A protein has these predicted regions:
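WD40-repeat beta-propeller superdomains and closely related acidic/aromatic-rich repeat-like regions
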Residues: 1-341
Length: 341
Protein backbone atom coordinates (compact mmCIF):
# COMPACT_ATOMS: atom_id res chain seq x y z
CA UNK A 1 0.00 0.00 0.00
CA UNK A 2 1.30 3.47 -0.89
CA UNK A 3 1.71 6.17 1.75
CA UNK A 4 -0.96 8.89 1.27
CA UNK A 5 1.24 11.49 2.99
CA UNK A 6 4.08 11.18 0.46
CA UNK A 7 3.94 12.58 -3.10
CA UNK A 8 3.22 9.70 -5.49
CA UNK A 9 4.93 9.55 -8.88
CA UNK A 10 4.59 7.14 -11.78
CA UNK A 11 7.58 5.35 -13.31
CA UNK A 12 8.93 6.81 -16.55
CA UNK A 13 8.51 3.38 -18.16
CA UNK A 14 8.07 -0.25 -17.22
CA UNK A 15 8.26 -3.69 -18.82
CA UNK A 16 8.06 -7.31 -17.68
CA UNK A 17 10.51 -10.23 -17.89
CA UNK A 18 7.90 -12.89 -17.21
CA UNK A 19 9.67 -14.17 -14.07
CA UNK A 20 11.04 -12.66 -10.87
CA UNK A 21 13.89 -10.18 -11.31
CA UNK A 22 17.09 -11.21 -9.51
CA UNK A 23 19.03 -8.01 -10.14
CA UNK A 24 19.05 -4.79 -12.19
CA UNK A 25 21.99 -2.71 -13.36
CA UNK A 26 23.03 0.17 -15.67
CA UNK A 27 25.65 0.13 -18.40
CA UNK A 28 28.68 2.32 -17.66
CA UNK A 29 27.54 5.00 -20.13
CA UNK A 30 24.00 5.04 -18.72
CA UNK A 31 22.39 4.19 -22.06
CA UNK A 32 21.19 0.68 -21.21
CA UNK A 33 19.20 -0.87 -18.38
CA UNK A 34 20.01 -4.52 -17.72
CA UNK A 35 17.69 -6.88 -15.85
CA UNK A 36 18.44 -10.49 -14.96
CA UNK A 37 15.65 -12.93 -14.14
CA UNK A 38 15.91 -15.80 -11.68
CA UNK A 39 15.12 -18.14 -14.61
CA UNK A 40 18.45 -17.22 -16.24
CA UNK A 41 17.14 -14.78 -18.83
CA UNK A 42 18.73 -11.33 -19.28
CA UNK A 43 16.96 -8.37 -20.89
CA UNK A 44 18.53 -5.17 -22.26
CA UNK A 45 16.36 -2.04 -22.43
CA UNK A 46 17.08 1.46 -23.77
CA UNK A 47 17.45 3.62 -20.66
CA UNK A 48 15.10 6.23 -22.12
CA UNK A 49 12.38 3.62 -22.57
CA UNK A 50 11.04 1.84 -25.62
CA UNK A 51 10.96 -1.75 -26.87
CA UNK A 52 13.25 -4.46 -25.56
CA UNK A 53 16.64 -4.08 -27.28
CA UNK A 54 17.85 -7.62 -26.71
CA UNK A 55 16.96 -10.65 -24.63
CA UNK A 56 18.89 -13.87 -24.17
CA UNK A 57 19.23 -16.90 -21.91
CA UNK A 58 22.41 -16.32 -19.92
CA UNK A 59 22.37 -19.34 -17.57
CA UNK A 60 20.48 -22.55 -18.24
CA UNK A 61 19.57 -23.37 -14.65
CA UNK A 62 19.03 -19.92 -13.16
CA UNK A 63 20.79 -16.62 -12.49
CA UNK A 64 21.99 -15.07 -9.23
CA UNK A 65 23.83 -11.87 -10.25
CA UNK A 66 23.70 -9.42 -13.15
CA UNK A 67 26.06 -6.43 -12.93
CA UNK A 68 27.64 -4.03 -15.40
CA UNK A 69 31.22 -2.80 -15.10
CA UNK A 70 31.23 0.77 -13.73
CA UNK A 71 33.79 1.90 -16.34
CA UNK A 72 33.78 -0.47 -19.33
CA UNK A 73 31.16 -1.83 -21.77
CA UNK A 74 30.99 -5.18 -19.98
CA UNK A 75 28.11 -7.03 -18.32
CA UNK A 76 28.88 -9.86 -15.90
CA UNK A 77 26.37 -12.52 -14.88
CA UNK A 78 26.62 -15.43 -12.44
CA UNK A 79 24.50 -18.55 -12.36
CA UNK A 80 23.74 -22.08 -11.30
CA UNK A 81 25.72 -23.56 -14.20
CA UNK A 82 29.00 -22.88 -12.36
CA UNK A 83 29.99 -20.03 -14.68
CA UNK A 84 30.48 -16.30 -14.63
CA UNK A 85 29.86 -14.87 -18.10
CA UNK A 86 30.84 -11.60 -19.77
CA UNK A 87 28.55 -9.93 -22.31
CA UNK A 88 28.34 -6.82 -24.46
CA UNK A 89 25.60 -4.73 -22.77
CA UNK A 90 24.59 -3.16 -26.08
CA UNK A 91 24.30 -6.19 -28.35
CA UNK A 92 24.04 -9.03 -25.84
CA UNK A 93 26.96 -10.85 -27.48
CA UNK A 94 28.74 -13.40 -25.27
CA UNK A 95 32.37 -12.32 -24.84
CA UNK A 96 33.85 -14.74 -22.32
CA UNK A 97 33.05 -17.56 -19.91
CA UNK A 98 34.86 -17.92 -16.59
CA UNK A 99 34.65 -21.20 -14.69
CA UNK A 100 33.75 -20.84 -11.03
CA UNK A 101 34.48 -24.45 -10.14
CA UNK A 102 32.08 -27.28 -9.37
CA UNK A 103 29.59 -25.16 -7.41
CA UNK A 104 27.09 -22.45 -8.33
CA UNK A 105 28.55 -18.99 -8.88
CA UNK A 106 26.50 -17.09 -6.31
CA UNK A 107 28.45 -13.89 -5.64
CA UNK A 108 29.84 -11.36 -8.10
CA UNK A 109 31.32 -7.89 -7.65
CA UNK A 110 33.12 -5.34 -9.83
CA UNK A 111 35.91 -3.20 -8.44
CA UNK A 112 34.62 0.41 -8.41
CA UNK A 113 37.09 1.40 -11.15
CA UNK A 114 36.31 -1.70 -13.21
CA UNK A 115 39.83 -3.16 -13.19
CA UNK A 116 38.86 -6.44 -11.52
CA UNK A 117 35.85 -8.74 -11.35
CA UNK A 118 35.46 -10.98 -8.30
CA UNK A 119 33.16 -14.01 -8.34
CA UNK A 120 32.73 -16.90 -5.94
CA UNK A 121 31.59 -20.50 -6.03
CA UNK A 122 31.54 -22.66 -2.93
CA UNK A 123 34.49 -21.96 -0.63
CA UNK A 124 36.63 -20.10 -3.18
CA UNK A 125 36.53 -16.83 -5.07
CA UNK A 126 38.33 -15.88 -8.26
CA UNK A 127 39.62 -12.49 -9.43
CA UNK A 128 39.68 -11.72 -13.16
CA UNK A 129 41.39 -8.76 -14.82
CA UNK A 130 39.58 -7.82 -18.07
CA UNK A 131 42.70 -6.14 -19.50
CA UNK A 132 45.35 -8.76 -18.82
CA UNK A 133 43.20 -11.86 -18.46
CA UNK A 134 44.95 -12.68 -15.19
CA UNK A 135 42.93 -14.88 -12.83
CA UNK A 136 43.72 -15.28 -9.12
CA UNK A 137 42.06 -18.04 -7.09
CA UNK A 138 41.70 -17.82 -3.34
CA UNK A 139 42.43 -20.55 -0.85
CA UNK A 140 39.43 -22.37 0.62
CA UNK A 141 37.37 -20.38 3.12
CA UNK A 142 35.92 -22.01 6.24
CA UNK A 143 32.55 -22.26 4.50
CA UNK A 144 30.75 -21.04 1.39
CA UNK A 145 31.67 -17.46 0.50
CA UNK A 146 28.57 -15.47 1.43
CA UNK A 147 29.46 -12.00 0.12
CA UNK A 148 32.19 -9.99 -1.62
CA UNK A 149 33.04 -6.27 -1.38
CA UNK A 150 35.85 -4.18 -2.89
CA UNK A 151 37.62 -1.23 -1.32
CA UNK A 152 36.80 1.93 -3.30
CA UNK A 153 40.22 2.10 -4.99
CA UNK A 154 40.02 -1.59 -5.95
CA UNK A 155 43.24 -2.51 -4.16
CA UNK A 156 41.64 -4.81 -1.60
CA UNK A 157 38.77 -7.27 -1.50
CA UNK A 158 36.72 -8.42 1.49
CA UNK A 159 35.05 -11.85 1.55
CA UNK A 160 32.56 -13.08 4.15
CA UNK A 161 32.05 -16.63 5.38
CA UNK A 162 31.39 -18.52 8.61
CA UNK A 163 33.74 -17.12 11.24
CA UNK A 164 34.24 -13.62 9.90
CA UNK A 165 35.63 -11.54 7.05
CA UNK A 166 38.87 -12.07 5.14
CA UNK A 167 40.78 -9.17 3.57
CA UNK A 168 42.87 -9.74 0.43
CA UNK A 169 45.39 -7.90 -1.72
CA UNK A 170 43.85 -7.83 -5.19
CA UNK A 171 46.90 -7.46 -7.45
CA UNK A 172 48.77 -10.33 -5.86
CA UNK A 173 45.82 -12.34 -4.57
CA UNK A 174 47.43 -12.53 -1.10
CA UNK A 175 45.52 -12.92 2.15
CA UNK A 176 46.06 -9.89 4.40
CA UNK A 177 43.89 -10.05 7.49
CA UNK A 178 41.10 -11.88 9.33
CA UNK A 179 38.23 -9.93 10.95
CA UNK A 180 36.68 -12.39 13.42
CA UNK A 181 33.01 -13.18 13.99
CA UNK A 182 31.50 -16.20 15.72
CA UNK A 183 28.91 -17.32 13.14
CA UNK A 184 27.86 -16.76 9.52
CA UNK A 185 27.45 -13.41 7.80
CA UNK A 186 24.64 -12.63 5.34
CA UNK A 187 25.82 -9.34 3.77
CA UNK A 188 28.99 -7.29 3.43
CA UNK A 189 29.99 -3.73 2.54
CA UNK A 190 33.09 -1.53 2.71
CA UNK A 191 32.81 2.21 3.37
CA UNK A 192 34.09 4.32 0.44
CA UNK A 193 36.90 5.79 2.58
CA UNK A 194 38.04 2.30 3.64
CA UNK A 195 37.59 2.97 7.35
CA UNK A 196 34.73 0.57 8.08
CA UNK A 197 33.90 -2.99 7.06
CA UNK A 198 30.29 -3.88 7.91
CA UNK A 199 28.31 -7.11 7.72
CA UNK A 200 24.84 -8.38 8.55
CA UNK A 201 24.89 -11.33 10.94
CA UNK A 202 22.73 -14.38 11.62
CA UNK A 203 21.91 -12.81 15.00
CA UNK A 204 19.79 -9.99 13.47
CA UNK A 205 22.54 -7.40 13.95
CA UNK A 206 25.12 -5.39 12.02
CA UNK A 207 28.75 -6.05 12.86
CA UNK A 208 31.31 -3.27 12.25
CA UNK A 209 35.09 -3.45 12.17
CA UNK A 210 37.16 -0.26 12.08
CA UNK A 211 40.43 -0.43 10.15
CA UNK A 212 43.18 -0.82 11.08
CA UNK A 213 41.53 -3.52 13.17
CA UNK A 214 42.33 -3.89 16.86
CA UNK A 215 40.93 -7.03 18.53
CA UNK A 216 38.15 -6.28 20.98
CA UNK A 217 37.14 -3.00 19.33
CA UNK A 218 34.58 -4.37 16.88
CA UNK A 219 31.03 -3.01 17.23
CA UNK A 220 27.65 -4.70 17.04
CA UNK A 221 24.40 -2.83 16.35
CA UNK A 222 21.41 -4.96 17.28
CA UNK A 223 17.66 -4.53 17.60
CA UNK A 224 16.68 -5.51 14.06
CA UNK A 225 13.56 -7.67 13.55
CA UNK A 226 15.16 -9.62 10.66
CA UNK A 227 18.55 -10.42 9.16
CA UNK A 228 20.17 -7.34 7.66
CA UNK A 229 20.83 -8.16 4.02
CA UNK A 230 20.52 -4.55 2.84
CA UNK A 231 23.51 -2.21 3.32
CA UNK A 232 24.20 1.08 1.51
CA UNK A 233 26.85 3.77 2.05
CA UNK A 234 26.57 7.49 1.35
CA UNK A 235 29.46 8.48 -0.93
CA UNK A 236 31.01 10.56 1.89
CA UNK A 237 31.20 7.45 4.14
CA UNK A 238 29.32 9.37 6.83
CA UNK A 239 25.98 7.55 6.60
CA UNK A 240 25.34 3.81 6.56
CA UNK A 241 21.77 2.81 5.66
CA UNK A 242 20.59 -0.63 6.78
CA UNK A 243 17.46 -2.72 6.20
CA UNK A 244 16.44 -5.71 8.30
CA UNK A 245 12.76 -4.82 8.72
CA UNK A 246 10.11 -2.30 7.60
CA UNK A 247 12.20 0.60 8.90
CA UNK A 248 15.52 1.86 7.57
CA UNK A 249 18.14 2.62 10.20
CA UNK A 250 20.76 5.19 9.16
CA UNK A 251 23.91 5.27 11.28
CA UNK A 252 26.21 8.29 11.47
CA UNK A 253 29.76 6.94 11.10
CA UNK A 254 31.47 10.33 11.27
CA UNK A 255 33.99 11.20 13.99
CA UNK A 256 34.32 8.36 16.49
CA UNK A 257 31.77 6.31 14.59
CA UNK A 258 28.36 4.87 15.52
CA UNK A 259 29.30 3.37 18.90
CA UNK A 260 26.81 4.48 21.54
CA UNK A 261 24.76 6.53 19.08
CA UNK A 262 21.11 6.32 18.05
CA UNK A 263 20.36 5.85 14.35
CA UNK A 264 17.99 8.01 12.33
CA UNK A 265 14.94 5.83 11.64
CA UNK A 266 13.21 6.17 8.27
CA UNK A 267 9.58 5.08 8.31
CA UNK A 268 7.26 4.76 5.33
CA UNK A 269 7.33 1.21 4.04
CA UNK A 270 4.38 -1.02 4.81
CA UNK A 271 6.49 -4.17 4.54
CA UNK A 272 10.06 -5.37 4.90
CA UNK A 273 12.76 -3.34 3.14
CA UNK A 274 14.38 -5.53 0.48
CA UNK A 275 16.66 -3.13 -1.44
CA UNK A 276 18.74 -0.03 -0.66
CA UNK A 277 20.91 2.09 -2.95
CA UNK A 278 22.56 5.52 -2.59
CA UNK A 279 23.39 7.76 -5.54
CA UNK A 280 27.09 7.38 -6.33
CA UNK A 281 27.77 11.10 -5.83
CA UNK A 282 24.54 12.50 -4.41
CA UNK A 283 22.46 12.55 -1.25
CA UNK A 284 19.41 10.54 -2.32
CA UNK A 285 18.76 7.06 -0.95
CA UNK A 286 16.37 4.75 -2.83
CA UNK A 287 14.61 1.97 -0.92
CA UNK A 288 12.32 -0.81 -2.08
CA UNK A 289 10.19 -3.20 -0.07
CA UNK A 290 7.72 -6.05 -0.02
CA UNK A 291 4.98 -3.39 -0.09
CA UNK A 292 5.82 -2.85 -3.80
CA UNK A 293 6.89 0.73 -3.13
CA UNK A 294 10.10 2.60 -3.90
CA UNK A 295 10.84 5.62 -1.68
CA UNK A 296 13.43 8.33 -2.20
CA UNK A 297 14.98 9.92 0.90
CA UNK A 298 17.51 12.56 1.87
CA UNK A 299 18.42 10.59 4.97
CA UNK A 300 21.03 13.04 6.21
CA UNK A 301 18.40 15.76 6.64
CA UNK A 302 15.01 14.16 7.19
CA UNK A 303 13.29 11.00 8.39
CA UNK A 304 10.42 11.49 5.93
CA UNK A 305 10.49 10.27 2.31
CA UNK A 306 10.60 12.89 -0.44
CA UNK A 307 8.51 10.89 -2.92
CA UNK A 308 7.31 7.40 -3.70
CA UNK A 309 6.70 5.17 -6.68
CA UNK A 310 4.13 2.37 -6.62
CA UNK A 311 4.97 -0.83 -8.53
CA UNK A 312 2.91 -3.99 -9.20
CA UNK A 313 4.81 -6.36 -6.87
CA UNK A 314 7.45 -6.64 -4.16
CA UNK A 315 10.78 -4.98 -4.98
CA UNK A 316 13.82 -7.25 -5.40
CA UNK A 317 16.51 -4.82 -6.63
CA UNK A 318 17.17 -1.07 -7.02
CA UNK A 319 20.06 0.64 -8.83
CA UNK A 320 20.90 4.27 -9.65
CA UNK A 321 22.07 5.43 -13.08
CA UNK A 322 25.75 6.49 -13.24
CA UNK A 323 24.81 10.19 -13.18
CA UNK A 324 22.27 9.73 -10.37
CA UNK A 325 19.38 11.26 -12.30
CA UNK A 326 17.33 8.06 -12.59
CA UNK A 327 16.88 4.71 -10.91
CA UNK A 328 15.72 1.31 -12.09
CA UNK A 329 13.96 -1.32 -10.03
CA UNK A 330 13.11 -4.99 -10.43
CA UNK A 331 10.09 -6.78 -8.94
CA UNK A 332 9.09 -10.26 -7.88
CA UNK A 333 6.50 -10.51 -10.67
CA UNK A 334 9.08 -9.70 -13.38
CA UNK A 335 8.39 -5.97 -13.64
CA UNK A 336 11.32 -3.72 -14.56
CA UNK A 337 10.65 0.01 -14.10
CA UNK A 338 12.66 3.22 -14.32
CA UNK A 339 11.96 6.48 -12.50
CA UNK A 340 13.47 9.96 -12.24
CA UNK A 341 14.97 11.49 -9.13
Amino acid sequence: MSNPLVPLRSPDWQANLGDAVAEVSWSADGSTVVAGGVDGRVALFPAAGGPLRQGFNAHAHGLFRCRCSPTEPLLATAGQDGLAKLWDPQSGALLKELAGGSAWVEQLSWAPRGKWLAFSAGKKFRLWNPTTGVVHESADHRSTVGALAFLADGSRLASACYGGVELWDVEGGRHLEHLPWKTSLVSLSWSPDGRWVVAGTQELAVQIWELPFRPGEELAMSGYPAKVRELAWHYSSRYLATGGGPEIMVWDCNGKGPAGSTPRILQGHGGKVTALSYQSAGHLLASGGTDACVFLWNAGKSSSPLRQFKLPAAITSVAWSPDGSRFVTGCRDGTVAAGSA
